[in-house]
């Protein structure tokens, strides 16, 4: 069965290209963004409004509350079921999003790691609180392969990797290679958008500013008013973190926008680095709405489908 994935850094036009593919090839879109799964987080995640989806079904958007734990493994399980349902109805499933780890979990599978050990997690958390970056340094010694793939600032992932290492006495990378359950029955065309950074970064800066000017801070206030704690995971993401700091009086509006822009650019850089390691990804070196990219993508998909 055919499966198409549209990947790339934030702001590269994945949603628009996925829509065009879906319209031409009778497809449905499956979200592959780790923030768009959360309800209420709309502006800062660039979630496509219902009125702009052009009648194309979108799946795995707004499926959990901000205070719920949601792992890549859970995403892979739900996404696989969704893809199977779309295919069974004779439609083309199209993955769209920039969370490379979700895409990897879906296509290649994840190993079933040990259950969470809260006392161990508490000790690791306390150590990181005493000295920032200490957990990542330990992970580099125990599992350099995993440490190279996980950013030092992504403390939850670093903590989980260390937890698994310590509980199993094996590197996570080794366990992952042994125990993966890859997606079966599908052949996948992976398209990766790669605009020039000198063009992408200014656009990201402008988009961040637009979000703050068009209700991001009010959206955060509304989420807090619903009773969701500021410690919820999606509040750690770029844009939302700075909006929260602004509400607390820790940053003025100009500073909040500046740091959100900087963090968004850094995130885009990490996404590009991740997707460069993605096997068999076809790079399209511009934005998803560029005419030549549209044409190339449509040709690629048509050939992939044998049309």
Swiss-Prot record:
Segments for region (Interaction with substrate tRNA): 33-36
Enzyme Commission number(s) from the entry: 2.5.1.75
Catalytic activity: adenosine(37) in tRNA + dimethylallyl diphosphate = N(6)-dimethylallyladenosine(37) in tRNA + diphosphate
Any Gene Ontology biological process: tRNA modification
Binding positions for substrate per the UniProt entry: 10-15
Role noted for this protein: Catalyzes the transfer of a dimethylallyl group onto the adenine at position 37 in tRNAs that read codons beginning with uridine, leading to the formation of N6-(dimethylallyl)adenosine (i(6)A).
Top-level lineage group: Bacteria
Keywords linked to the UniProt accession: ATP-binding, Magnesium, Nucleotide-binding, Transferase, tRNA processing
Entry similarity comment: Belongs to the IPP transferase family.
Matches recorded under InterPro entries: Dimethylallyltransferase, IPT, P-loop_NTPase
This protein's record includes keyword Magnesium: yes
List of residues binding ATP: 8-15
Taxonomic lineage of the native organism: Bacteria, Pseudomonadati, Acidobacteriota, Terriglobia, Bryobacterales
Assembly notes: Monomer.
PANTHER family reported for this sequence: TRNA DIMETHYLALLYLTRANSFERASE (PTHR11088:SF60)
Protein name: tRNA dimethylallyltransferase
Pfam family, one: IPPT
Marked site: Interaction with substrate tRNA: 99, 121
Matches recorded under Gene3D superfamilies: 1.10.20.140, P-loop containing nucleotide triphosphate hydrolases (3.40.50.300)
Co-factor(s): Mg(2+)
Molecular function, one GO term: tRNA dimethylallyltransferase activity
